[in-house]
From Swiss-Prot:
The keyword Glycoprotein does not apply. Keywords: Chaperone, Coiled coil, Cytoplasm, Nucleus. Can form homomeric and heteromeric protein complexes with NRP1. Binds histones H2A and H2B and associates with chromatin in vivo. This is NAP1-related protein 2. The gene is NRP2. It comes from Arabidopsis thaliana (Mouse-ear cress).
């Protein structure tokens, strides 16, 4: 009886060892396949970057041409910003006055694409600051952090960093923010390297949403004005129809 139990225990132990060995072998094979996939993914990423680098060069003169046309349209960037659902909330009344001098906006990837990008605001001569260009640069570091640098603004005498006041909402007008948009540049002077997940949300919106097609947001504002105008026309037409109906009722009553 004891011998049978001993044999059974030994058999179970051998089965467990066999299962463990098979499991280890399967995991090793799975890891090899996963390593192969990683190599393919790395190669794909490198090739995607090469394509992106190639087309960045091709896009550059087209973006330059777009900027030249935009310069001929009054308040283009101010209108596009104000019409954007996120960016429009960031401009104080004083910011809007400054944005009237904004002549061009440029987003430029680093040459290798993966190491970062910069956003540059170019201004016509204005009464607010000396700078012709304000640039904010994002450099992606190997340790997973991002180095952020920005042009220190040289405000003209008596101007300084424009901090708005909290304006009450008037009718359908949006409530204006308390802090100037231009703190976006000055904040970078006080920041150390930040983690990737703490990336600059404003920069992401400008780079990924506004910059690719600002005309979408510029036209949004124009479309809304046209829509409001159509509404006014419809209301006038309805009032005219109502007056005609009243006249007809009066004539029937006189008969």
């Amino acid at each position: 009886m004891v011998t049978d139990k001993s044999k059974k225990a030994k058999t179970e132990e051998e089965n467990v060892e066999q299962i463990d060995a098979e499991l280890v072998l399967s995991i090793e094979k799975l890891q090899e396949i996963q390593d192969d996939l990683e190599k393919i993914n790395e190669k794909a990423s490198d090739e995607v970057l090469e394509v992106e680098q190639k087309y960045n060069v091709i896009r550059k003169p087209v973006y330059d041409k777009r900027n030249e046309i935009i310069k001929t349209i009054p308040d283009f960037w101010l209108t596009a910003f104000l019409s954007h659902p996120a960016l429009g909330e960031l401009l104080t009344e004083e910011d809007q006055k400054i944005f009237k001098y904004l002549s061009s906006l440029d987003v430029e990837d680093a040459k290798d694409v993966k190491s970062g990008y910069s956003i540059t605001f170019s201004f016509n001569p204005n009464p607010f600051f000396e700078d012709g260009k304000l640039t904010k640069t994002f450099t992606f570091l190997e340790e997973g952090t991002t180095k952020i640098t920005a042009t220190p603004i040289k405000w003209k005498e008596g101007k300084g960093l424009a901090n708005g006041v909290n304006h009450e909402k008037n009718g359908n007008k949006r409530a204006l923010p308390e802090e100037s948009f231009f703190t976006w540049f000055s904040d970078a002077q006080h920041k150390e390297d930040v983690e990737d997940e703490m990336q600059d949300e404003v920069a992401d919106i400008i780079k990924e949403d506004l910059w690719p097609n600002p005309l979408t947001y510029f036209n949004n504002d124009a479309d809304e004005e046209d829509f409001d105008g159509d509404d006014d026309g419809d209301e006038e037409e309805k009032e005219g129809d109502s007056d005609e109906d009243d006249d007809e009722e009066d004539e029937v009553g006189e008969e």
